[in-house]
């Protein structure tokens, strides 16, 4: 039920919490079916908290390894990262809701690349080139306003607190910029990412 297929785009996104029987067992199977059909397949998964049962973490690590073999791109969100952004009064349901929001943002961010107008519009072929057979990925979303809004937004995007990845060493990058910004704003944002990833964008 968590499988999302975007009509007409030929891509499949699999959102899943790893560690339990359903996600760990089913996710790699669904991903393989999609990839075998030649469909761009993106996995977005969570790792359980370290305080959960050791077997659950071991299952999650094994499941992530299997799903990585059967998706083009994989985004991993460790639940432990929630401990860095919530206070002691945050309840477990509230914390898990934040993790789910990041999962949703990851999927939404990719579809928005194609569907929403931007300074330079992308099509599915652009996304496919960057995401096909690429392995672990980093994705982030930022939003800001004011004089340095573009730079502030991209700084938010590359430093997502709930991901264990960074863009350092990235071989491919897509930057999607939208809003009322100037050419210089867009250049500042792209230059910032280029310096961090040390690649040509």
Give the label of every model feature segment.
Residues 2-13, 199-200:
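Single conserved hydrophobic/aromatic residue that forms the stacking wall/gate
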Residues 11-19, 45-47, 138-140, 173-178:
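Short glycine-rich or small-residue beta-strand-to-loop segments that form or flank ligand, phosphate
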Residues 11-14, 33-122, 126-131:
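N-terminal glycine-/lysine-enriched basic segments
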Residues 19-30, 52:
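Short glycine/serine/threonine-rich phosphate/pyrophosphate-binding segments
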Residues 29-33, 60, 190-194:
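Short, solvent-exposed amphipathic alpha-helical segments in soluble enzyme
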């Amino acid at each position: 039920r968590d499988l999302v297929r975007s009509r007409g785009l030929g891509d499949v996104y699999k959102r899943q919490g790893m560690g339990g029987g359903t996600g760990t067992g089913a996710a790699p199977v669904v991903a393989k079916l999609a990839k075998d059909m030649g469909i761009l397949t993106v996995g977005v998964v969570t790792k359980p908290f370290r305080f959960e049962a050791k077997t659950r973490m071991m299952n999650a690590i094994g499941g992530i390894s299997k799903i990585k073999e059967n998706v083009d791109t994989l985004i991993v969100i460790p639940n432990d990262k929630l401990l860095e952004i919530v206070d002691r009064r945050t309840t477990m349901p509230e914390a898990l809701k934040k993790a789910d929001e990041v999962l949703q943002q990851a999927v939404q961010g990719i579809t928005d690349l194609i569907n929403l107008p931007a300074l330079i519009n992308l099509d599915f072929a652009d996304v496919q080139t960057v995401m096909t057979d690429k392995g672990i990925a980093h994705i982030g979303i930022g939003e800001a306003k004011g004089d340095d809004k573009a730079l502030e937004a991209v700084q938010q995007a590359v430093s997502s607190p709930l991901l264990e990845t960074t863009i350092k060493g990235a071989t491919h990058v897509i930057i999607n910029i939208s809003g009322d910004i100037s050419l210089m704003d867009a250049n500042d944002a792209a230059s910032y990412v280029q310096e961090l990833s040390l690649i040509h964008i």
